[in-house]
């Protein structure tokens, strides 16, 4: 049974039957509207965020399976502050603030996609992304929060989230 895999990025709940998805699906003999509706149903919870979607199609039976990944780190951070797009000038124009608990929650959601081996490393990675798109954390530049993590200021908070990190898939 030959299978074909299609990987695309869609806005949660808003996949469209146009190119490049529609023509690819119709070439494989699938009902484009049906597949797009199913993609929109399974990605609806990520409305407004870019979500990776993988469609595995059995060429002989025309059966397909849709797998939804975790939205991009940038999408999750922007959603957390209710912003539509990153700052065009992150060094001078800040677009929102998150607390470290929110960063830890996002790190746990992203664990399967992150190369970080520890929660602390994952949080530091997310802090770097937050800084690059104009988000402050705990009211400060994320670079300063990284220094405070290294100094042990957030050890209690990190310890509280370690169990969730260890239980998360990845």
Swiss-Prot record:
Keywords in alphabetical order: Ribonucleoprotein, Ribosomal protein, RNA-binding, rRNA-binding
Matching SUPFAM superfamilies: Ribosomal L11/L12e N-terminal domain, Ribosomal protein L11, C-terminal domain
Record GO terms (molecular function): large ribosomal subunit rRNA binding; structural constituent of ribosome
PROSITE patterns attached to this UniProt entry: RIBOSOMAL_L11
Subunit composition and interactions: Part of the ribosomal stalk of the 50S ribosomal subunit. Interacts with L10 and the large rRNA to form the base of the stalk. L10 forms an elongated spine to which L12 dimers bind in a sequential fashion forming a multimeric L10(L12)X complex.
UniProt KW Transmembrane keyword: no
Name of the protein: Large ribosomal subunit protein uL11
Cellular component, GO, one term: large ribosomal subunit
Matches recorded under NCBIfam families: PRK01143.1
Coiled coil location: none
